[in-house]
Amino acid sequence: MNTETKALPAWLDKVRWDDNGLVPVIAQEASTNDVLMFAWMNREALAKTIETQRAVYYSRSRKRLWFKGEESGHVQHVHEVRLDCDEDVVLLKVEQVSGIACHTGRHSCFFQKFEGTVDGGDWVAVDPVLKDPEHIYK
């Protein structure tokens, strides 16, 4: 299926898209269940993800499809796609190529952990940088 020339499939209508035609997406490492990242998809991105078995998101800032790893090489091979009980969040179970999902060079975008109390806490980076971002993006 080429989503650029054909009508999008009817199964996409089951997803509860927001007013902007987007749905939140969580990418999870299939082998470890680590939560890697959060992003958005539109209908075309979800259809392309199913078609190619590689994660394709929608970039709200660039207003275009974002093929994960198109610049960094850190693609996500999709093993499974799930829809939550309210049909308004998508979960991708992926294999993260190179182990780096975050643009900061870390395994996960969720590398900051809150430590402390409501009166005196802060966010602390608890996961290491695996590769300097300046060497990832050229």
Swiss-Prot record:
E.C. no:
3.5.4.19
Q: Which NCBIfam families match?
A: PRK00051.1
Pathway, according to UniProt? Amino-acid biosynthesis; L-histidine biosynthesis; L-histidine from 5-phospho-alpha-D-ribose 1-diphosphate: step 3/9
Cell compartments where the protein resides: Cytoplasm
Query: What the protein does?
Result: Catalyzes the hydrolysis of the adenine ring of phosphoribosyl-AMP.
Q: Which family does it belong to?
A: Belongs to the PRA-CH family.
Binding residues for Zn(2+)? C85, C102, C109
Q: Which PANTHER family match?
A: HISTIDINE BIOSYNTHESIS BIFUNCTIONAL PROTEIN, HISTIDINE BIOSYNTHESIS BIFUNCTIONAL PROTEIN HIS7
Residues annotated as signal peptide? none
Q: Name one GO biological process term.
A: L-histidine biosynthetic process
Organism for this UniProt entry? Burkholderia ambifaria (strain MC40-6)
SUPFAM superfamilies according to UniProt: HisI-like (SSF141734)
Q: Report the enzyme's class at the first EC level.
A: hydrolase
Does the record bear Methyltransferase in its keywords?
A: no
Q: Catalysed reaction(s)?
A: 1-(5-phospho-beta-D-ribosyl)-5'-AMP + H2O = 1-(5-phospho-beta-D-ribosyl)-5-[(5-phospho-beta-D-ribosylamino)methylideneamino]imidazole-4-carboxamide
Q: Enumerate the GO terms in the molecular function aspect.
A: magnesium ion binding; phosphoribosyl-AMP cyclohydrolase activity; zinc ion binding
Entry note: cofactor: Binds 1 Mg(2+) ion per subunit.
Subunit description: Homodimer.
Q: Name the keywords, alphabetized.
A: Amino-acid biosynthesis, Cytoplasm, Histidine biosynthesis, Hydrolase, Magnesium, Metal-binding, Zinc
Positions annotated to bind Mg(2+): D84, D86, D88
Kindly report the protein's main subcellular placement as a broad class: cytoplasm
Cofactor(s) demanded: Mg(2+); Zn(2+)
Which residues span the membrane? none
- Give the record's GO CC terms: cytoplasm
What is the protein name stated in its UniProt record?
Answer: Phosphoribosyl-AMP cyclohydrolase
